[in-house]
């Protein structure tokens, strides 16, 4: 019988600490969202100078920082470099598409990309940070930081549970994510803004209002039309991007290896990062010594 490992408690403590930080970060973002929905602060669109905007900015930023701190020890340098790129991608595409007659947003491609490569916590942090940074140019997006974080979290969970291993499942996961995100964002759009800020999405809300719907009902219907299709497109674009990466580049991300996020990441490939086996253990079954050496 082998004796219990004396190093196990010290190995478990960092994992427990990371989990606690993730929970605290999620709670900070959720609490800020509840505050906005319950208080319905109309002055939040005036910029970061208002009290409600400062509360929202502090709550969302605290949640995003806690999430980043939680996952930072597990993130490779390649992910840290990608996060600022993802923020810029979200803001540029979101600002451009929001000014057109396209009834979509396309402001979550960077968020979903980070979520697929680095996991739910990193995706949620990227989504929240995107809204925070974007709010300095467009204050109306700040209250939607909770929805952006939720999209990143759900995208990371979809990747973890294999919905990106089959290309056709990616838009299905995006469609489902869009339904949830639309329901979450509708109260903010209704009670804080009295509508949506996009040109095309605002026209859809106006059409439902003209048919006699209440403001919340009209915005919810618009969200259930636009958000699922938008997220299906976003998830599909991200799937194309990650599969276009060379296999060696994809396997640089620990989350991708650990959870076999993409097709072709077999257990043998994942084992390439595992600690070397002890004496008496040969290559994995079904592989030749030559292929094992190449791995």
Predicted regions and their residues:
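Short juxtamembrane and helix-loop transition motifs at transmembrane-helix boundaries
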Residues: 12-13, 39-48, 66-70, 89-90, ...
């Amino acid at each position: 019988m082998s004796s219990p490992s004396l190093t196990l408690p010290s190995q478990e403590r960092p994992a427990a600490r990371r989990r606690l930080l993730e929970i605290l970060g999620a709670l900070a973002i959720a609490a800020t969202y509840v505050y906005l929905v319950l208080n319905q602060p109309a002055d939040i669109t005036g910029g970061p100078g208002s009290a409600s905007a400062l509360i929202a900015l502090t709550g969302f930023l605290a949640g995003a920082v806690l999430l980043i701190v939680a996952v930072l020890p597990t993130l490779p340098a390649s992910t840290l470099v990608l996060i600022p790129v993802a923020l810029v991608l979200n803001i540029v595409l979101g600002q451009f598409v929001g000014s057109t007659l396209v009834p979509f947003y396309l402001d979550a491609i960077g968020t979903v990309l980070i979520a697929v490569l680095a996991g739910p916590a990193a995706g949620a942090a990227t989504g929240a940070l995107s809204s925070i940074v974007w709010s300095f140019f467009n204050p109306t997006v700040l209250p939607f930081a909770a929805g952006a974080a939720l999209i990143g979290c759900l995208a990371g969970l979809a990747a973890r549970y294999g919905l990106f291993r089959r290309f056709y499942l990616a838009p299905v996961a995006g469609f489902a994510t869009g339904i949830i995100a639309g329901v979450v964002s509708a109260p903010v759009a209704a009670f804080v803004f009295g509508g949506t800020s996009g040109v095309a999405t605002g026209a859809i809300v106006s059409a439902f209002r003209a048919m006699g719907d209440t403001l919340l009902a009209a915005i919810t219907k618009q969200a259930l039309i636009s958000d699922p299709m938008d997220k299906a497109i976003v998830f599909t674009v991200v799937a194309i991007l990650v599969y276009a990466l060379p296999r060696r580049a994809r396997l640089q991300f620990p989350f991708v290896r650990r959870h076999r996020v993409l097709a072709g990441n077999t257990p043998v490939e994942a084992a390439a990062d595992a600690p070397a086996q002890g004496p008496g253990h040969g290559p994995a079954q079904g592989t030749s010594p030559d292929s094992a050496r190449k791995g």
